Amino acid sequence: MTAQTLYDKLWNSHVVREEEDGTVLLYIDRHLVHEVTSPQAFEGLKMAGRKLWRIDSVVSTADHNTPTGDWDKGIQDPISKLQVDTLDKNIKEFGALAYFPFMDKGQGIVHVMGPEQGATLPGMTVVCGDSHTSTHGAFGALAHGIGTSEVEHTMATQCITAKKSKSMLISVDGKLKAGVTAKDVALYIIGQIGTAGGTGYAIEFGGEAIRSLSMESRMTLCNMAIEAGARSGMVAVDQTTIDYVKDKPFAPEGEAWDKAVEYWRTLVSDEGAVFDKEYRFNAEDIEPQVTWGTSPEMVLDISSKVPNPAEETDPVKRSGMERALEYMGLEAGTPLNEIPVDIVFIGSCTNSRIEDLREAAAIAKDRKKAANVQRVLIVPGSGLVKEQAEKEGLDKIFIEAGFEWREPGCSMCLAMNADRLTPGQRCASTSNRNFEGRQGNGGRTHLVSPAMAAAAAVTGRFTDIRMMA
């Protein structure tokens, strides 16, 4: 039998039918639903007189529009309130395996909530009307975002039409140095291959450095696969995966668990499997990263200086660099560790899990917010993450440092709720996109790890966390 990649196995086991042009009908196991991309899909079902094909495939929560402060006042923005209320109404009418509404303890960012509930399992196909659905590939699952029309199609038929991507293996060999996190690995890779480097591919991450990562770190890495242009990212199943899933609310139990684990252990690329493209990186080469421009590929080590567009020979790239520097209000040659910040945001589906908050708290402990920093928002990814952080006393560390301890939600990752930047504000952010206006009109976003964000909060500028005793 021909050796198969992990992607081959996941894809082939879910093909319902294939056409001559390579288009397939792909079966979907788990459909994650939130308030932004579902209203039109539910409306389409109503107009056609259809029901959900498989109610028990749907897990839902509200996240993009929910406020992260003043919950006693409810949702103040009328459009946001309408979207959340509409989701409530639609789930009540159509049903779901589980629904975590606004202010429920289980509510949170869909890509944090799904895994912590055991709704994401190895071997699954997982879709959501959100581009960062690639997060769930950390479990040895095939996961990617879909558009609103596909959301309706999945609801009605449990399938989507798709064409198989090419396969890419990105190996990170060796051990990561102290202070280097999965976020740094992701940004480093994007800096090396570019935001179009993964276009048309499904990426499998492998190598010693990847195998040593926790599940939460693997989720961070796969979350960022879309920023490299890939359709999906994934990590092979190992004991770390199985240990994380065990005893989660929606994980199998008893004999079903044993059978599942037996199958899950096959979800690795076979020895001798051929990938369409491969990259190998050395973990020793990766330092803490900071983006300087308006694309995740505009990223450098913290010890670097803002690059000079005049040194770029490609005229298109040079023009892009010039525009980015103008928007970001930066001058070529400025050391990254001399750039001051106004706002710090620690949260998002990339970095709002308990390990992320622990990293940030370790830096913030016994320190205070720098005088030039206007606000530091700490936004847990779910009510359960918030509860665990408070059990560990992390909230007290943040509050004593002068940070804001918020309620769960997508928050300042995107300007769709009350948490947003104003024109010219510079933000150290643990989110995933630094596009123009992403965090608010005229806002300037620098992507970093949770520890690097916390360091910026207490020093007032980008700082190498390895220099902080």
From Swiss-Prot:
Family matches, as InterPro entries: 3-IsopropMal_deHydase_lsu (IPR004430), Acnase/IPM_dHydase_lsu_aba_1/3 (IPR015931), Acoase/IPM_deHydtase_lsu_aba (IPR001030), Aconitase_4Fe-4S_BS (IPR018136), Aconitase_4Fe-4S_dom (IPR036008), IPM_dehydratase_rel_enz (IPR050067), IPMI_cat (IPR033941)
Domain of life: Bacteria
Gene3D superfamilies: Aconitase, domain 3
Pathway note: Amino-acid biosynthesis; L-leucine biosynthesis; L-leucine from 3-methyl-2-oxobutanoate: step 2/4
Cofactor(s), by name: [4Fe-4S] cluster
Keyword terms: 4Fe-4S, Amino-acid biosynthesis, Branched-chain amino acid biosynthesis, Iron, Iron-sulfur, Leucine biosynthesis, Lyase, Metal-binding
Enzyme class at the top of the EC tree: lyase
A Pfam family assignment: Aconitase
Gene Ontology biological process terms, A to Z: L-leucine biosynthetic process
EC number: 4.2.1.33
Binding site for [4Fe-4S] cluster: C349, C410, C413
Described function: Catalyzes the isomerization between 2-isopropylmalate and 3-isopropylmalate, via the formation of 2-isopropylmaleate.
Name of the protein in its database record: 3-isopropylmalate dehydratase large subunit
Underlying gene: leuC
